[in-house]
Amino acid sequence: MTSSSTILQRLTQTIEARKSADPAHSYIAKLLSSNEDKVLKKIAEEAAETIMACKDNDREQIIYETADLWFHCLIMLARHDISPEAILSELERREGVSGIEEKLSRSQNQPEPTKAE
């Protein structure tokens, strides 16, 4: 089995390399050069397919569709110059913190909404 960090590094390198590739010859380059809505719609499509695979309790499809979803999320992150390591660091920061506690800390750090006049 390939280590998850190694495959993430290789995929990230491939996506970065495709930033300068010809969109006519590379699916990744095509998505990177398109408007962001196209990438976001693809993520929504893959998320919906993942949800349907879960509802069908189809293990193989869940794995397949989740891989598609993660792949397209990596492309979206590359568009914003965010590395997978930034996401992994955030997950590591949250590790061991209860979901309730983490959510509460987010709400306490939000500015108070202003009243519309």
From Swiss-Prot:
- Which GO BP annotation is one of this protein's? L-histidine biosynthetic process
The record's section on Gene3D superfamilies has:
MazG-like (1.10.287.1080)
Q: Which domain of life is it from?
A: Bacteria
GO cellular component, as recorded: cytoplasm
Q: Where is this region: Disordered?
A: 96-117
Locate the compositionally biased regions of type Polar residues: 106-117
The pathway entry for this protein reads as: Amino-acid biosynthesis; L-histidine biosynthesis; L-histidine from 5-phospho-alpha-D-ribose 1-diphosphate: step 2/9
Which family does the record claim for this protein? Belongs to the PRA-PH family.
Its ancestry begins with: Bacteria, Pseudomonadati, Pseudomonadota, Betaproteobacteria, Nitrosomonadales
Q: Where is the composition biased (Basic and acidic residues)?
A: 96-105
**NCBIfam families the UniProt entry points to:** histidine_hisI, PRK00400.1-3
* Localization of this protein: Cytoplasm
Q: Per the record, a Pfam family?
A: PRA-PH
Cite the GO molecular-function annotations of the record.
Answer: ATP binding; phosphoribosyl-ATP diphosphatase activity
List UniProt keywords, sorted A-Z. Answer: Amino-acid biosynthesis, ATP-binding, Cytoplasm, Histidine biosynthesis, Hydrolase, Nucleotide-binding
Organism of origin is Nitrosomonas eutropha (strain DSM 101675 / C91 / Nm57)
* Name of protein: Phosphoribosyl-ATP pyrophosphatase
User: EC number(s)?
Assistant: 3.6.1.31
User: What's its catalytic activity?
Assistant: 1-(5-phospho-beta-D-ribosyl)-ATP + H2O = 1-(5-phospho-beta-D-ribosyl)-5'-AMP + diphosphate + H(+)
Major location category of this protein: cytoplasm
